[in-house]
């Protein structure tokens, strides 16, 4: 059962990062990649865990540099790291601050649970709520890097 929870957590984490990446970069991702990417990432983690761990941070930067060869490199780094950092920060904020305020506590942080998957699935809607309430426009960032 723990392996199923672990695989679902990986899938939900990569799904959320892909959705965040698509939202801020305005680069459409084909629906097939939402299925293939988590599978390939889990396969990479099984074959060589250190490479899989570091590939998680560099894959979006490399993808942006490939897609936008003649654009700003700093903007490519921003688009590559933003989804990963926001996923981590909002997940921690939900898990350690928001849910305990609502009376939901994690008693054993060392083991994975359905609670972790719920946190991952709530990161993207929470991000959308923050972006819409603050009226952030990521297209203005492109103009700042010109």
Where are these regions (language model features)?
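Hydrophobic alpha-helices of bacterial signal-transduction systems
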Residues: 2-146
């Amino acid at each position: 059962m723990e392996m199923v929870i672990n695989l679902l957590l990986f899938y939900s984490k990569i799904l959320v990062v892909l959705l965040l990446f698509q939202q801020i970069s305005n680069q459409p991702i084909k629906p097939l990649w939402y299925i293939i990417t988590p599978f390939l990432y889990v396969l990479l983690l099984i074959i060589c865990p250190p490479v899989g761990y570091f590939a998680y941070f560099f894959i979006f930067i490399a993808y942006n540099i490939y897609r936008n060869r003649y654009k700003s490199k700093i903007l490519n780094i921003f688009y590559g790291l933003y989804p990963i950092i926001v996923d981590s920060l909002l997940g921690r904020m939900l898990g350690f601050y928001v849910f305990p305020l609502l009376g939901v506590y994690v008693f054993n942080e060392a083991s994975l649970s359905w609670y972790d998957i719920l946190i991952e699935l709530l990161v993207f809607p929470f991000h959308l709520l923050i972006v819409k309430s603050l009226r952030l426009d990521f297209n203005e960032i492109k103009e700042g890097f010109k």
